[in-house]
């Protein structure tokens, strides 16, 4: 059995330790104090209640993925999130909304996990054809730059479902 963890690095929950909108974790989150060690992870338009969030869901504040503090915490520190779990035996990560992560972030993450375990898997959630994906006006390099080992193949999933339901006679499978 291989254990692949779900890496959600695009956003956090509004009631996570890092944001703590409901003060569940003692009021040290970015929503509670500008002195929070996590404050710079987020973009506040008007602190604390007006902030950038994933697809405008205020329960999912978006993270500044390339902020040096976030990069250290998630990837590069000796006991970063990915290093911690890889050293405990995780076999890789599935990246939630990979197309909303900068290529540079994915490349750093890949280097780190492969440095710990060269056989680790880095799988991306990409809903469209990942080989031709353009996100935020930029052609993605999931495969051409060797960023991801694989992607979740939703176009194939859709083709199978359409065929089973008799919608297209299997045209999408050719």
Model segments located where?
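N-terminal structural segment of carbohydrate-active enzymes
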Residues: 1-2, 12, 17-20, 72, ...
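Glycine-rich, aromatic-flanked loop segments that form ligand/cofactor-binding clefts
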Residues: 1-12, 32-44, 123
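A structural motif corresponding to the C-terminal end of an alpha-helix
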Residues: 1-3, 84-91
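Active-site-proximal helices and loops of the catalytic beta/alpha 8
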Residues: 10-11, 16-26, 81-83, 91-174
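A residue-identity detector for tryptophan
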Residues: 41, 47, 54-55, 70, ...
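Short, acidic/polar
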Residues: 67-87
């Amino acid at each position: 059995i291989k254990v692949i963890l779900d890496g959600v690095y695009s956003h956090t929950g509004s009631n996570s330790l890092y944001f703590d909108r409901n003060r569940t974790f003692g009021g040290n989150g970015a929503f509670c104090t500008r002195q929070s060690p996590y404050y710079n992870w987020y973009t506040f338009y008007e602190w604390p209640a007006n902030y950038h969030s994933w697809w405008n869901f205020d329960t999912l504040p978006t993270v500044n993925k390339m902020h040096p503090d976030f990069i250290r915490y998630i990837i590069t520190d000796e006991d970063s999130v990915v290093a911690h779990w890889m050293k405990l035996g995780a076999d890789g990560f599935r990246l939630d909304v990979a197309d909303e992560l900068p290529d540079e972030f994915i490349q750093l993450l890949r280097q780190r996990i492969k440095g710990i375990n060269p056989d680790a898997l880095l799988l991306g959630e990409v809903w469209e054809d990942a080989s031709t994906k353009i996100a935020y006006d930029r052609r993605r390099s999931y495969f051409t730059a060797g960023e991801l080992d694989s992607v979740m193949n939703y176009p194939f999933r859709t083709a199978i479902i359409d065929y089973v339901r008799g919608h297209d006679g299997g045209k999408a499978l050719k």
